[in-house]
Amino acid sequence: MSTTIDVPESNNVAKEKVLLLGARPRPGGWKKGVAIMDFILRLGAIAAAPGAAATMGTSDQTLPFFTQFFQFEASYDSFTTFQFFVITMALVAGYLVLSLPFSIVVIIRPHAVGPRLFLIILDTVFLTLATASGASAAAIVYLAHNGNQDSNWLAICNQFGDFCAQTSGAVVSSLVSVVIFVLLIVMSALALRRN
């Protein structure tokens, strides 16, 4: 004599579907990786911006010969464009240091929109300042290297080689910080997307 026990089908299938829908992981885990990369890029820009300001601010060369009335000297403070460059890159460096706590908040809370929006707005403002100062200094450095035949401006880099090397290095460093700012803005814009 064998006994059979009939077990009715349970409704666990419907319950499992509901649990699966409710237990979905939150999308956008990649935003934390973007926030970490943002912090690392800010550290790189912190190295580039004050490096540019310090290099330009210390650029000075005096030629070894002089006359009774004249001494031939090239210094960053002889050019108002270079003064603008030093002040602007120092401001950019200060902003980058002050933006680090906000970048850390974005790492801790990658889905927070407020700090990321604040950073993208100020990054755009300081990108504009860094681009303006870098481009204007690049124009003066170009004139120092090549001169301008139409205006009878002579190239001074043949005589002031060290000065021109320092100013060129400062311009390159500022343009590195500009590229980093562009990357920061693009990454923040991607992270602000809803998907």
Swiss-Prot record:
Keyword Repressor: no
Membrane topology of the entry: Multi-pass membrane protein
GO biological process: cell wall modification; cell-cell junction assembly
Keyword Cell membrane included in the entry's annotation: yes
Segments in the Extracellular topological domain: 55-86, 138-169
An example Gene Ontology CC term for this record: Casparian strip
Cytoplasmic side: 1-33, 108-116, 191-195
Membrane spanning stretches: 34-54, 87-107, 117-137, 170-190
Keywords: Cell membrane, Cell wall biogenesis/degradation, Membrane, Transmembrane, Transmembrane helix
Entry-linked Pfam families: CASP_dom
Subcellular location per the Swiss-Prot or TrEMBL entry: Cell membrane
NCBIfam families tied to this protein: A_tha_TIGR01569 (TIGR01569)
Role noted for this protein: Regulates membrane-cell wall junctions and localized cell wall deposition. Required for establishment of the Casparian strip membrane domain (CSD) and the subsequent formation of Casparian strips, a cell wall modification of the root endodermis that determines an apoplastic barrier between the intraorganismal apoplasm and the extraorganismal apoplasm and prevents lateral diffusion.
Family classification: Belongs to the Casparian strip membrane proteins (CASP) family.
Quaternary structure and interacting proteins, as annotated: Homodimer and heterodimers.
Protein name per UniProt: Casparian strip membrane protein 3
